[in-house]
Design a protein with these regions (language model features):
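Non-catalytic alpha-helical coupling and interface elements of nucleotide-dependent molecular machines
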Residues: 152, 169-173, 208-212
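Mixed-charge, glycine-rich, non-catalytic linkers/tails in nucleic-acid processing enzymes
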Residues: 135-144, 177, 182-219
Length: 219
């Protein structure tokens, strides 16, 4: 196999197309979310003006500052998912761009009702969005971060590796993008969709690697 692996991905924001793609998926899929603050740059500019120029109560200031400083890593009440990527091999992925609440709800409903086995890396991050929006979790899943932490790593916690980018750099190189691209304004950029698709394929490849290792050890 040649490295780095070139990922083949396709993307859509069309609900009909997304539904058709999801119906055709195999039984084991790797999934990943991209997220962003739910507030636009324009909305944040207005928040900044209010914070700098208005007399606010302590509670008003606290809430407004929390909204102003929010990013894709913030609480689900302050964020939205912008992409769902799904990989079913080490190089094939689809990316669904979630640019409205109808698409987001469709995605959440799919993830908590499908019987396909879902592979996630660092599932607590993604699952907090699923749980917050549905009150449920996927039916069948496993977490490659937890599995890596349990099976592959050094007993010394200061020497172990669980980051997907670290674990899979040998196969995909450095595919990270700037944190500034995780915004509502940047969600349509080709680089963001490529990043999202690579995340899903890297997760699937890590899942395959772990399966091979555990088979060797007869685990």
């Amino acid at each position: 196999m040649e490295y780095p692996i070139a990922v083949n991905y396709k993307y859509t924001s069309n609900l009909y197309t997304a539904r058709k793609w999801l119906e055709e998926l195999p039984d084991v899929i790797a999934c990943d979310f991209e997220t962003a603050s739910k507030f636009t740059r324009k909305e944040k500019d207005l928040m900044k003006f209010r914070l700098d120029n208005r007399r606010l109560s302590f509670e008003e200031h606290r809430v407004l500052l929390q909204q102003y400083e929010s990013n894709g890593l913030s609480h689900p009440s302050l964020t939205v998912i912008t992409h769902l990527s799904i990989g079913w091999s080490d190089r094939d992925a689809l990316v669904i761009i979630c640019d409205n609440n109808s698409m987001r709800q469709f995605i959440f409903d799919f993830l908590v009702t499908t019987k396909r086995h879902q592979i996630w890396h660092n599932s607590p991050f993604d699952f907090k969005h699923i749980r917050f929006n549905t009150g449920l979790l996927p039916i069948s899943y496993e977490d490659t971060m937890l599995k890596s932490k349990s099976l592959l790593n050094d007993a010394n916690p200061y020497r172990d590796k669980v980051s997907l980018k670290e674990l899979m750099a040998y196969a995909y190189g450095d595919w990270a993008i700037s944190k500034d691209e995780f915004t509502l304004e940047e969600m349509w950029k080709e680089s963001t969709s490529k990043y999202s698709g690579t995340d899903a394929c890297a997760t699937f490849k890590l899942y395959q690697d772990l399966q091979e290792e555990t088979t060797k050890w007869r685990i």
